[in-house]
């Protein structure tokens, strides 16, 4: 009699799945963590809700209303979830039939679009960006048949640039009546003028992902948002867990989204942008750095001579960067989160010492 292992019982697509390599999963024993695009220092909050004996609201009113006001949309156009990552998955679960429909995304970009689709058993199609990392609209048009959700990250992670707004409009026209277009705006606080939130009334098939993990300095909270028209939100509400946000998470999120919380966030953004420009200028003068790319975010992508050796050398010194070599068109590239001035100086000094 053949022995069936536990792994044999698992779904085939799960057996074949490569999990997303998050910064924490990749590990390292560093003291300068510049690999996850987090804010470099902790922001303090006091819990005000002492009702942990009760289940939380599914969509906490204060969080939804505060975020709607901040984003300039109606409360019924907002869904809150466990990070934007849950929003990515909810959109696939609501709109894609496993084994029939597909998602489409444009590498090099964020890795969770493919992981979420593959976990659910939904086909992934890719249309690599052009040499300038802008959308290949003809390539997308050629592959749209059977696609239900298109993910576009803007500013794009890991390249750091904004997608041309006219290309977004063309994409939204191409997909009208066919697919949901998801603009992943995880880093939009660093370039708020580029948000598509004002386009929701014009495009019923547009959804926007947001997070408190970056400019709001709350990566450990796991709190994200989907902005979309009410019809889309109602469908997502059918597939979301009954209690996606714990009471402490909702409590802190509401405080972070208060008027004073928004002011504090904008002060952090100003500080990070100034530090980003300092680091970009310094990187351009370092011999082992071949190219530094413009950034609209809190991280910098740069191409290095002997990038793998540079990555390991800094890793061994406790400076943890993000290796992008395996991403399409990013050979030799490392991504550096913008941290404190002290952290920037550690990176600069370590890179200057590299022998190339």
Curated annotation (Swiss-Prot):
It is an enzyme of class 2 (transferase). Keywords: Amino-acid biosynthesis, Aminotransferase, Histidine biosynthesis, Pyridoxal phosphate, Transferase. Its cofactor is pyridoxal 5'-phosphate. The modification N6-(pyridoxal phosphate)lysine is found at residue 214. Pfam families: Aminotran_1_2. Homodimer. CDD domains: AAT_like (cd00609). It catalyses: L-histidinol phosphate + 2-oxoglutarate = 3-(imidazol-4-yl)-2-oxopropyl phosphate + L-glutamate. This is Histidinol-phosphate aminotransferase. Its EC number is 2.6.1.9. Pathway: Amino-acid biosynthesis; L-histidine biosynthesis; L-histidine from 5-phospho-alpha-D-ribose 1-diphosphate: step 7/9. PANTHER family: HISTIDINOL-PHOSPHATE AMINOTRANSFERASE, HISTIDINOL-PHOSPHATE AMINOTRANSFERASE-RELATED. One of its GO terms (biological process) is L-histidine biosynthetic process. HAMAP family: HisC_aminotrans_2. Belongs to the class-II pyridoxal-phosphate-dependent aminotransferase family. Histidinol-phosphate aminotransferase subfamily. GO terms for molecular function: histidinol-phosphate transaminase activity; pyridoxal phosphate binding. SUPFAM superfamilies: PLP-dependent transferases (SSF53383). The lineage of its organism: Bacteria, Pseudomonadati, Pseudomonadota, Gammaproteobacteria, Enterobacterales.
